A protein has these predicted regions:
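Structural recognition of the conserved hydrophobic beta-strand(s) that form the central parallel beta-sheet
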Residues: 60-61, 235-238, 265, 305-311
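Conserved nucleotide-binding/hydrolysis micro-motifs of P-loop NTPases
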Residues: 13, 21-23, 65-68, 193-195, ...
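Phosphate/diphosphate-binding loops
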Residues: 39, 48-50, 57, 217-218, ...
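Conserved helicase ATPase motor motifs in RecA-like P-loop NTPase domains
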Residues: 161-162, 270-271, 288-318, 338
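Inter-Walker segment of RecA-like/P-loop motor cores
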Residues: 207-248
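ATP-dependent helicase/translocase motor core
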Residues: 1-164, 168-185, 190, 194, ...
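Conserved RecA-like ASCE ATPase "motif II neighborhood" in helicase/translocase motors
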Residues: 234-295
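Interdomain helical connector at the RecA1-RecA2 junction of SF1/SF2 helicase-like NTPases
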Residues: 319-398
């Protein structure tokens, strides 16, 4: 007998193989598959279909332990949609809600993939629309190829030089993914409010199809929206706000389900800090680059969603999350194609200040700015030499 059966009304949607805490989980869900093969309907229970002998579409296996990559076979909720032979089991953050399971069952992925593969992209190059260039079309096709032909991969990275039109490219991609119903809702994730506003303006202003913008055709939720509307097709949010909603939310009945978004777009996926860079208030919410990567990875791991990363400069931590870029269009190629202008070699100007820094000798009395009193005050005599190098200028020296 199955450990748990998931019914919505009288219809059987899933079975769960429950293991003891810490016990090995069969990541290929062998036991759940046996349950699904040997199900016998009775007492008015409805079987939704038969898929290669399996009489239930969604299978789960878990031991109650939160997923840890280091002990993959001993943690997490493992899930498999048996309706397509090419589907592989994967670890997810939790169980799908009844509403999510119904939507998953109603969604025809095979048909959506067929539309995505067969529908022409020519309209994206029209002057009355996005007017995309050839390399932008190739970028879209590269991501779509992963979605259609590599269902075992759930992430893709686009590397495109600054100034080559990443925003227009992603608008074209998002439109096709929504138009074909391949995904029902996209989360557009950024680390700064300004980036979100710039991208949102693009979705509102750029014409996509039939002289209409994305926002003219589909409903968009902006940064002020905490919980996406039921008819929302794309939702803009910062990493900071999303982490708070997912992991520091006290309102249990408003917790986002793992299927609230089935596609996530991460803008500026490389994300890094410079030692002498002044951080704004939003950036200060992250301790450092590692803290930022950790947090946006938490968001990616929470949702059962395909993720697309956008970057101009793929860093090691970026490829560790998204794998190697599925499409590259660098500065040199853009210059040769005539879309960007090459830069001259940098001229480095050195000064005594930048070379030697600022030094106060022992016995001197340095001055500091008193924020509370809004005045310059003199300190006591220094007991030892005090030196600031270039990296400390922006943060500690006026």
């Amino acid at each position: 007998y199955a450990d748990y059966a998931l019914f919505i009304g009288t219809s059987l949607y899933g079975v769960i193989e429950a293991k003891k805490y810490g016990q090995d989980i069969s990541t290929n869900l062998d036991q759940s598959k046996r349950y699904a093969l040997n199900i016998v309907p009775q007492d008015g229970a409805d079987i939704l279909g038969d898929w290669n002998g399996y009489k239930v579409p969604f299978l789960y296996s878990t031991n109650g332990r939160e997923y840890l990559q280091q002990i993959a076979t001993k943690s997490g909720v493992w899930y498999l949609d048996v309706r397509q032979k090419y589907n592989n089991s994967r670890s997810i953050k939790g169980f799908h809600s009844p509403e999510d399971l119904q939507k998953k069952f109603e969604q025809d992925i095979a048909l959506a993939n067929k539309k995505l593969e067969e529908n022409s992209l020519d309209f994206l190059q029209l002057k009355t629309g996005l007017s995309l260039r050839d390399y932008q079309i190739r970028a879209i096709q590269a991501v779509e190829n992963v979605i259609i032909h590599h269902p075992d991969l759930n992430r893709a990275l686009l590397a495109m030089a600054t100034g080559t039109g990443k925003t227009r490219t992603i608008i074209g991609l998002a439109y096709r993914l929504i138009q074909t119903n391949r995904f029902k809702r996209i989360l557009f994730l950024v680390d700064r409010t300004l980036l979100a506003k710039q991208a949102l303006d693009g979705f509102k202003d750029y014409k996509v199809d039939d002289l209409k913008s994305f926002s003219d055709i589909y409903h968009i939720d902006g940064l002020k929206t905490t919980w996406p509307d039921i008819d929302s097709r794309i939702h803009f949010a910062t990493v900071q706000s999303m982490v708070k909603r997912l992991y520091y939310n006290d309102v249990e009945d408003k917790a986002l389900s793992i299927d609230a978004y089935d596609c996530i777009i991460v803008d500026e996926a490389h994300r890094g800090y410079l030692l002498d860079k002044e951080m704004d208030d939003e950036e200060m919410e992250f301790k450092n680059q590692d803290d930022y990567v950790s947090k946006y990875r938490q968001v990616l791991d929470y949702f059962d969603a395909f993720a697309v990363g956008l970057t101009a400069t793929p860093a090691l931590h970026t490829t560790e999350i998204f794998n190697k870029p599925v499409f590259n269009y660098g500065l040199r190629e853009a210059v040769l194609d005539g879309y960007l202008v090459d830069q001259d070699p940098p001229i480095r100007i050195t000064t005594q200040l930048s070379e030697e820094g600022i030094v106060w000798e022992k016995g001197e009395k340095p001055t500091v700015y008193d924020k509370e009193g809004n005045q310059i005050v003199e300190l006591e005599e220094l007991e030892d030499e005090l030196k600031f190098d270039v990296s400390g200028f922006n943060k500690r020296v006026i």
